[in-house]
Amino acid sequence: MTELFDKIKEITELDGIAGYEHKIRDFFRQKMTPFVDEVETDGLGGLFGIKHSKLERAPRVMVAAHMDEVGFMVSDIKEDGTLRAVAIGGWNPLVISSQRFTLYTRTEQAIPVISGSVPPHFLRGNNGGASLPKVEDIVFDGGFADKTEAESFGITPGDIIIPKSEAILTANQKNVISKAWDNRYGVLMVTELLQSLKNEQLDNTLIAGANVQEEVGLRGAQVSTTKFKPDIFLAVDCSPAGDVYDNQGKIGEGTLIRFYDPGHVMLKDMRDFLLTTAQEAGVKYQYYCAGGTDAGAAHLKNSGIPSTTIGVCARYIHSHQTLYAMDDFLQAQAFLQTIVKKLNRSTVDLIKNY
């Protein structure tokens, strides 16, 4: 597991929110290029490696992670030198206050900032209790004396603010705590998939990579599926674990078979294919029906694309400290590799046989 943790640490500590995925894209391009026939981007910056099949009428199978994590963008510099920001992606306001972040200026200068909070001493007039903060009311503080000093460091509206967090192992060495597993899980998964298939001749043309701007409305998936026109779309994404709250999604219990979420209902034949494949491969899996992934956008593009998500769950996602099991990654990895190898023309036609 040490080698896997090192890979996880490297990729989760990269910084990149929607619209600013360039660090992840550069890393991803370097990792995937040796294992594919060609690398292409879409008009928003999604990056995909293509392995061409030698077979006529080979189906086009798209495997897509997303590069972006949640963060913030500076909207205003106040006269006192603190910063207002808008959320890029979904945030629970309760997890934002008193956390360390990194602000990146236009010239890529990294500036440490913290998110503001109200100490209990200032709440005593309100019976000592704090009201629920609103995301838009939270300020970011870099210790600047005033607006002029903040601007002298190159800070302007539009600069990005990203959680500062180091990836660590839990005491039992089975789990990781980090930021951005949603969705660096997917980026690492696709990288490992392409490496494992380096010497394989597939019965499909594989288009594997990562979209941009998933966290702000599944935007990249709409562009990439239009460009690459897949017959089958497999999102690779991380979802919230509900095990602490007695809900679906338990860490350590394997990959997720997501038969429903508010943006996507899995087709019957796709569900049958996934269950049969998981059982034949001996993959540990669990059922899941929450959240949302790029499959929600992809399945509606072109004339309709059968889609699903190959995922894992993690506790406390969209925060500085997400906790997840490395074995779940390995189960999902085995599942995805088996799926991709099985998706030949007859299997794809069966899934699409209405």
What positions do the PLM features span?
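N-terminal hydrophobic/helix-forming segments and targeting peptides
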Residues: M1-Y354
